[in-house]
Amino acid sequence: MKKAALFALLLVFMYSCGSSNERGELVGVKSKRKWFAEKPYGMVSIKGGSFTMGKQDEDPLGAMNAPTRTVTVQPFYMDETEITNSEYKQFVYWVRDSIVRTKLAYQAEFASGDEEPDPAGKNKAEGIQLYAFASKDTVNESPYQKYMRENYYEIGEGIDSIKPLNWEEELFWNREDYPDTDYVEVMDSLYIKKDEALNGIRSFNTKLLEYRYFWFDNEEAARTGKNRKDFLKDEVLNVYPDTTVWIKDFNYSYNDPMHQEYFAHKAFEGYPVVGVSWNQARAFCHWRTKNKNSYQRKKKNLGLVPAFRLPTEAEWEYAARGGLDYAKYPWGGPSTTSDRGCFLANFKPVRGDYAADGALYTVEAVSYNPNGFGLYNMAGNVSEWTNTAYNQMSYYMGSTMNPNVENRENRRKIVRGGSWKDVAYFLEVGSRDWEYADTARSYIGFRTVQDYLGTKKQ
């Protein structure tokens, strides 16, 4: 009798544990971790809201492509400044290091020949073997890890990579420090040939700096009934800025120092990166998301962040206005100078006079006063890529809620803000301009945004 009572009590206890004290009520599925919005480093919070988009004043060019209308944009985060040379170098160096480590790992695998694998790491690696693919613990692996190892074979940085790269060992760039001839062979294949070197100084072959990434075409997927794999896009492109834009953009002009030093010299680290196409800017956004989420995964208890991306044209204009509706410029006033006669942005104020504002070319990304949202150089310095495709009629046919005319077939992309070589007209918050997606210029840069998840109340 006692055993029966004890068994019944055990059943009741097990039942109560399985029910999670729901008592049959609809309580919802709650996440284990509470979500809170974290402002990304180097960004400012834009509350979002409605504003009058377009040209409030008569357009002196008669373009008629930016009529006024009221639109609403969601809250988002935006880079405080344009992406700088220093920040873009972090992307370039990551791609460079990935390529070097991949080649070193293959060379280590080739050099090891028929040697028995050493998953436990009992034998101390030397030379090229220090850069071998990171070992997987096949003894203590989970059933899932074993299944993935036996059925998939992938090299890279994904969470399911079977042969991940070894990022722990330091790379040597000084040729005197190369550990062995296998290392020398790999590095030799990555540098320009000796007969192409200037004054015998060989540099890294920037043509090899290619970044591969995948993205999902939501726009096409929502409108066509194909298979999911049809909307997965594979992109491979070179990420190094086109430094020759300083020569190509200006005929019969001496700009050799900018061509040679602007991206390379530390004097320009805090200046906005230029020579980057729309396609390269999107690749940078993908890498920035990947880089942050890789860190989040390593910490395990942190959630993944929303993707970084280029701003839509509407988001860019809303941010540029800084909360001032009907303003002509980001600082609000109708003039490009202060009451003391000082220029408020970096642009070409007079025909032929590029340096009247104190700078011939670009200035540091943190220059002049920020606008009402705390954003620097939303007018002048460099024009900025947006995610939106250019269409002269987009203001007439676009939505009034987060408007964005996105057309993958249209290679013309909106650039905003004007630059150091532009007249004041292009600095106006309502002025529109465009450039081809695969074209880089010495006066076009970019900044990124990230979506704010949830509602940000005023």
Q: Which positions does each model-derived feature cover?
A:
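Non-catalytic, alpha-helical, charged scaffold/linker segments
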Residues: 103-224
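Post-signal-peptide N-terminal segment of Sec-exported extracytoplasmic proteins
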Residues: 36-66
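N-terminal pre-domain segments of enzymes
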Residues: 21-36
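Short capping motifs at secondary-structure boundaries
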Residues: 76, 83, 92-101, 288-298, ...
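Short, structured beta-strand segments at or near domain termini in extracellular proteins/domains
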Residues: 442-458
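C-terminal motif of bacterial Sec signal peptides marking the signal peptidase cleavage site
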Residues: 15-16
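Sec-dependent N-terminal signal peptides
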Residues: 5-12
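Functional-site microenvironments in short loops/helix caps that host divalent-cation chemistry
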Residues: 21-25, 45-46, 52, 57, ...
